[in-house]
Design a protein with these regions (language model features):
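Conserved, mostly hydrophobic/aromatic
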Residues: 32, 59, 99, 112, ...
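Shared catalytic-loop signature of beta/alpha-barrel
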Residues: 54-57, 87, 205, 211, ...
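Structured beta-strand/loop patches that form or line metal/cofactor-binding pockets in enzymes
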Residues: 1-44, 325-327
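Extended hydrophobic packing segments that form well-structured cores
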Residues: 351-368
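Short, glycine/acidic-enriched loop or turn micro-motifs at the edges of active sites
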Residues: 41, 163, 192-195, 219-220, ...
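Metal- or metallocofactor-binding catalytic centers and their adjacent structured scaffolds
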Residues: 28-110
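Metal-dependent enolase-superfamily TIM-barrel catalytic cores that perform enediolate-based chemistry
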Residues: 117-234
Length: 368
C-alpha cells in the first residue's frame, strides 16, 4: 500500500481541568485505509503547531508516495534524514512518534490484526493507576481524595499525586492523605523536575515513611549526574521516562543508575516498537517498567497496544481529568473511567491500534 496523504492535526479539547491542546497525525493510503498517531510532550502537547510544522515540512515530504511494507525502515529514514537539522529528541522525536504510531495503525488494519497481536500479545487487561494533576500543596487531603474517588470506586489501588512549589507542605498533605486512604492503596509522587538535590533527599526520607512507591522526576532529567546522585541517596525509588526519547537514552539512564522505575511512552519515545523495547530493558537492570500516558484517545490506543505486548510492564498511567477527552474523542465510554473494572482496563484487540477518533470531533477541535 502506498502513502498518499499525511495530515497534521493540532487540536484543542476540553478536559476536566479545562482546555488542553493535543497533536494527532492522520496518514492515508491509496487503498483507502486511514491510520492515526499522536504525540505528547508530557501533558498533551503544549505547542501543537510546532509538531504540525515538523510533520508538514520535514516528515510528510519523505513519506508521501512511499510504499508501506514495514514501519521501521520508514521511521528510521525520518530520523536519519532530519537529525542534523532537527535533532533526535524533544519535538522531533515526539512528532516522529506520532508518525510511527499511525504507520503501525495502517499495518495492523491492512493485516486485519491488532498491533499487539503482530508484535506478540501477552495480556488482555492491565492495572491502571490514577494520575491526579492538582498540586498536593495547593489543597487539603480531602480535596485530593475527592478527585481520586471516581477511580477508587472502580477498584483502582494505585494513585499518583504531584508536588508543587512548597514541597514540604506537599508531604504534610500527603501524610494526611495516606491516613485517609489507608495502607491498601499504593501512592506515588511526581515532582515534575522541580526539586534540587537537598530537597529531594529531605522529602524522599519523609516519603519513605509514608510508603511512597516512587518519586518521579525530582530533578531535570538532563542533569544526569545529579539524577544519579539523587537515586543513590533516595530511600524511595526514582522514576522517569517521559523525557527519554529513544532506547539509547533509556539504556544510558539505566546503566548510570539514574532510575529504578522506567516509564516509556510511545507518544514520546519514538513510537510503539521503541516504547516496547525500552520496557524490555528494565528487567536486566532490576528495574520496574510502568507506562506513561498523558495524551488523547489515539495516544491511549498506542499505549494500550504496548501494554498488551510488553511482558515486563505491570502498570499504566490513567490521568483522572482525561476521562472527558477520551469520551468526547471516541463518542463513548469504552476507555473512560467507567470502563475500568477491578482496577484494570481492557486492552483493545481490533485491527491497528484499536481506536479511532470521531471525524466530526477532529473537525470541531482543529486549531486553525
Amino acid at each position: 500500500m502506498k502513502i498518499v496523504r499525511v495530515t497534521p492535526l493540532p487540536l484543542s479539547c476540553r478536559s476536566a481541568n479545562g482546555p488542553m491542546t493535543f497533536f494527532v497525525v492522520r496518514i492515508e493510503t491509496d487503498d483507502g485505509l486511514v491510520g492515526y498517531g499522536e504525540s505528547c510532550d508530557c501533558f498533551g502537547v503544549s505547542f501543537p503547531a510546532v509538531h504540525a510544522a515538523v510533520v508538514r515540512d520535514a516528515f510528510a515530504p519523505l513519506l508521501v508516495g512511499r510504499e508501506l511494507i514495514a514501519v521501521a525502515p520508514l521511521v528510521d529514514e525520518l530520523r536519519v534524514s532530519t537529525r542534523r537539522q532537527l535533532g533526535q529528541s524533544w519535538a522531533s522525536a515526539q512528532a516522529r512518534s506520532a508518525i510511527e504510531i499511525a504507520l503501525w495503525d495502517l499495518v495492523g488494519q491492512d493485516a486485519g490484526r491488532s498491533v499487539s497481536a503482530i508484535l506478540g500479545r501477552v495480556r488482555d487487561t492491565i492495572p491502571v493507576y490514577a494520575g491526579s494533576s492538582p498540586f498536593l500543596d495547593d489543597h487539603d487531603a480531602a480535596f485530593h481524595l475527592d478527585r481520586l474517588t471516581p477511580m477508587l470506586e472502580r477498584g483502582v489501588r494505585h494513585v499518583k499525586l504531584r508536588t508543587g512549589p512548597d514541597s514540604d507542605r506537599a508531604v504534610d498533605v500527603l501524610a494526611d492523605l495516606r491516613r485517609l486512604l489507608g495502607r491498601d492503596v499504593e501512592i506515588m509522587v511526581d515532582a515534575s523536575e522541580s526539586l534540587d538535590l537537598p530537597t529531594t533527599a529531605r522529602i524522599s526520607d519523609r516519603m519513605a515513611e509514608l510508603d511512597v512507591r516512587w518519586l518521579e522526576e525530582p530533578l531535570l532529567q538532563s542533569r544526569h549526574s545529579a539524577v544519579a546522585a539523587a537515586a543513590a541517596r533516595s530511600r524511595v525509588p526514582i522514576a522517569a521516562g517521559e523525557h527519554l526519547f529513544s532506547t539509547e537514552e533509556a539504556l544510558a539512564a539505566l546503566v548510570a543508575g539514574e532510575i529504578s522505575v522506567i516509564q516509556p511512552d510511545p507518544c514520546i519515545s519514538g513510537g510503539i516498537a521503541e516504547a516496547r523495547e525500552i520496557a524490555g530493558l528494565a528487567a536486566g537492570f532490576g528495574a520496574r517498567a510502568v507506562l506513561h500516558y498523558h495524551a488523547g484517545l489515539v495516544g491511549l490506543g498506542a499505549v494500550l497496544q504496548v501494554a498488551a505486548c510488553a511482558p515486563g510492564v505491570d502498570l499504566l498511567e490513567y490521568p483522572v481529568h482525561l476521562d472527558t477527552v477520551l469520551r468526547t474523542q471516541s463518542g463513548g465510554d469504552e476507555l473512560g473511567i467507567s470502563a475500568i473494572v477491578d482496577g484494570r482496563l481492557a486492552l483493545p484487540d481490533r485491527p491497528g491500534i484499536g481506536v479511532a477518533p470521531l471525524a466530526s470531533v477532529l473537525s470541531e477541535s482543529l486549531i486553525s
